[in-house]
Regions:
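Glycine-centered short loops/turns at secondary-structure junctions
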Residues: 119-120, 197
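N-terminal helical cap/lid subdomain that shapes the substrate entry/recognition surface
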Residues: 2-107
């Protein structure tokens, strides 16, 4: 069956989340008068990301709400477990202002989307919330390029669960065999998509993250994607997919 649609991850696939997070946190800590509290900017960022990974995993497992994981990240990072929800929300909103000011697409995103626009339908599957990612896509000028936006917070299940990928395919009205998925995480994105029956592309921008899961297609930039999809033997051409 030919591939008719491409589903996309957003953070660190289309949008440079890592860069925006680092820049936003540094500016936020400076404005909050916390610049010296954590030693270097790198040390502060490491603590922030440790808290983010811990509580995002809890959200993905259904242990806390989307807003709850934000509040817990703030409490852990500040080492203030008694911080109220309103206080944690306010701190996080101030951080968001700096983080959003640093939002940017990777330079290969628009050329790839333009090259694929006439041949494939497009959608998004994200482990975030619809409100968060809709706002992000609109800010970045991408929202109208995607027919569907499916997010874990509303869906009640997150990647790499097969059900998340199947729900996104259902939203497109296509079977998994006719859908490709592109994401930067080898397990959450690529393995999850593969296990759900989609054609999985792991976007390894650094090119040095070690071997990926079997049965997925590893690319180091989105400029590779149009040629690889067009070269799939299911279209009767020599396969360019490895």
């Amino acid at each position: 069956m030919p591939i008719r649609a491409v589903l996309w991850d957003i953070d660190d696939t289309l949008f440079d989340y890592t860069g925006a997070d680092a820049a936003g946190l540094a500016r936020h800590l400076r404005d909050e008068g916390l610049g010296e509290r954590y030693g270097t900017a790198a040390e502060a960022l490491a603590l922030w990301r440790k808290a983010t990974e811990l509580h995002w995993a809890r959200f993905a497992a259904g242990e806390v709400t989307f807003l709850g994981q934000r509040q817990e990240r703030v409490r852990e990072f500040l080492e203030e477990p008694a911080l109220t929800a309103d206080e944690a929300d306010a701190w996080f909103e101030r951080y968001l202002g700096h983080y959003q000011a640093a939002w940017a697409l990777f330079p290969d995103v628009l050329p790839a989307l333009d090259a694929l626009a006439g041949s494939y339908r497009h959608g998004v599957l994200s482990n975030s919330s619809e409100a968060n990612q809709d706002h992000k896509l609109r800010h970045l000028g991408l929202r109208e390029r995607f027919e569907v936006l499916v997010c874990a917070a509303e869906l009640g299940v997150s990647k790499p669960d097969t059900a998340a990928f199947l729900a996104a395919c259902d939203a497109l009205g296509l079977p998994p065999a006719e859908v490709a998925y592109v994401g930067d995480q080898p397990e959450i994105d690529a393995r999850g998509a593969r296990d759900a029956g989609l054609t999985a592309f792991w976007l390894d921008r650094d090119g040095g993250r070690g071997p990926g899961p079997g049965g997925v297609h590893r690319i180091e930039g989105l400029e590779q994607l149009p040629g690889l999809l067009a070269g799939d033997t299911r279209f009767g051409a020599r396969s360019g997919i490895r």
